[in-house]
């Protein structure tokens, strides 16, 4: 059962759930908290790689990722990031989120943006118990027109679901947690699997 607005506010008030900066009441709906777009992005560079062998030797996968992913792009305030049709880009939420070990979060895109072709997450919308950091957004433009995305715009909504008990292996205590304390648009770390 997901938390309702009253429960979200209670969890925020007593510090079990932390969202920084804390969202005002107007951004907390019946079962969700609206999140905004941050100013950090990462895209695929122009490259000549025919493919990335995801099950190949780790050093080759790592080198391929290094060749195709851009450095982090920090957008100045007021500027737009343009996502063209058929393009994938990574970005982050403006808000940082800290979940306790007995709560899982879910990220959903906004219907109004989806109706223009914008996917906010390609597949990864679960936020693990014990997570701490900003949420990476996996943007894909499936529409026909370029989309101008501006830092600070409402980009998605988080919902929260209590677990049956505390997780034995929350994200913040896992040795293999590849994105622990993530603050920027971190590229894939599939080579760390």
From Swiss-Prot:
The keyword Cytoplasm does not apply. It catalyses: dCTP + H2O + H(+) = dUTP + NH4(+). The active site is at residue 138. Transmembrane segments: none annotated. Residues 169-193 are annotated as: Disordered. It comes from the Bacteria. InterPro entries: dCTP_deaminase, dUTPase-like_sf, dUTPase_trimeric. GO terms for biological process: dUMP biosynthetic process; dUTP biosynthetic process; nucleobase-containing small molecule interconversion. It is an enzyme of class 3 (hydrolase). One of its GO terms (molecular function) is nucleotide binding. DCTP binds at residues 110-115, 128, 136-138, 171, 178, 182. Pathway: Pyrimidine metabolism; dUMP biosynthesis; dUMP from dCTP (dUTP route): step 1/2. Signal peptide: none annotated. Its EC number is 3.5.4.13. Pfam families: DCD. Keywords: Hydrolase, Nucleotide metabolism, Nucleotide-binding. Homotrimer. NCBIfam families: dCTP_deam. Catalyzes the deamination of dCTP to dUTP. Belongs to the dCTP deaminase family. This is dCTP deaminase. It comes from Pectobacterium atrosepticum (strain SCRI 1043 / ATCC BAA-672) (Erwinia carotovora subsp. atroseptica). The gene is dcd.
């Amino acid at each position: 059962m997901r938390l309702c607005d009253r429960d979200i506010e209670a969890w925020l008030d007593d510090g079990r759930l932390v969202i920084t900066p804390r969202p005002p009441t107007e951004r907390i709906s019946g079962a969700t908290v609206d999140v905004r777009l941050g100013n950090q992005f990462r895209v695929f560079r122009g490259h000549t790689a025919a493919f990335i062998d995801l099950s190949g030797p780790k050093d080759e996968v790592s080198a391929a990722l290094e060749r195709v992913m851009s450095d982090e792009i920090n957008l100045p305030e007021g500027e737009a990031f343009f996502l063209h049709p058929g393009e994938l880009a990574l970005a982050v939420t403006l808000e940082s989120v800290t979940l306790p070990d007995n709560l899982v979060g879910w990220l959903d895109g906004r219907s109004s943006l989806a109706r223009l072709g914008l996917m906010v997450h390609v597949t990864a919308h679960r936020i693990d118990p014990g997570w701490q950091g900003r949420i990476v957004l996996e943007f894909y433009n499936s529409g026909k027109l370029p989309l101008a995305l501006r830092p600070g715009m409402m980009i998605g909504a988080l919902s929260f679901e209590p677990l049956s008990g505390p997780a034995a292996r929350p994200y913040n205590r896992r040795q293999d947690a590849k994105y622990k304390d993530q603050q920027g648009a971190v590229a894939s770390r599939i080579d760390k699997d």
